Amino acid sequence: MLKTIKNIFFISLFFLFANCDQTSQSKNNSNGIVVVKVFSSLTCPHCADLHGTIYEKLKNEYIGIGKVKFEHNAFPLDLAALNAEKILQCTTDTKIKMSFLTELYKKQNKWAAGSDIRVINESIKKIGEGFNLTQDQMNKCLENKKLEEKILNERIEAQKNYKVKSTPTIYLNKKKYEGKRDYKSFK
């Protein structure tokens, strides 16, 4: 009887320690992938600069070989940014979406400077056509209230859960990064 109790005790300890080890691995991201989560607005000049300097270098050095996972998170600061985000989300292909995102940031000073929202939307759609999006697809995305609600709810969640107050806000493996925004410091 005592031997059975000892065996049960040691088996329980084994499972307890095995479970603890598993938990610590997931917290420490044992697969070695660094998750870069960026909250940005497509009309934010600092976001465009960050994307142009840091994302492009990360893509070439780390994302392509699976060392870094980059997450763009919508945090629209105005209607133009919201509409650009809605059109960006028309595509479901991740590679195309990231290329489209890069192009929106590169051409931000052109499309975001329109005289009214209709002019801005047309400028965004011209860029979208270069990524195989049709006028009909983009118009449907612009008119999609559920998509708009989803984007705005994600923004609210970012404010609550990540304490995002401005753009760009960056998290590295769930830790807020507040250092310089040049690639050397970021790396």
Mark where each language-model region is.
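Sec-dependent signal peptide cleavage junction
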Residues: 21-33
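Sec-dependent signal peptide recognition
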Residues: 3-11
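C-terminal motif of bacterial Sec signal peptides marking the signal peptidase cleavage site
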Residues: 16-19
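C-terminal cap of thioredoxin/glutaredoxin-like
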Residues: 41, 55, 126-187
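Short active-site neighborhood of thiol/selenol oxidoreductases, capturing the structured segment around
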Residues: 30-48, 70-73
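Active-site-proximal beta-strand/loop segments in catalytic clefts of secreted hydrolases
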Residues: 39-41, 73-76, 104-105, 173, ...
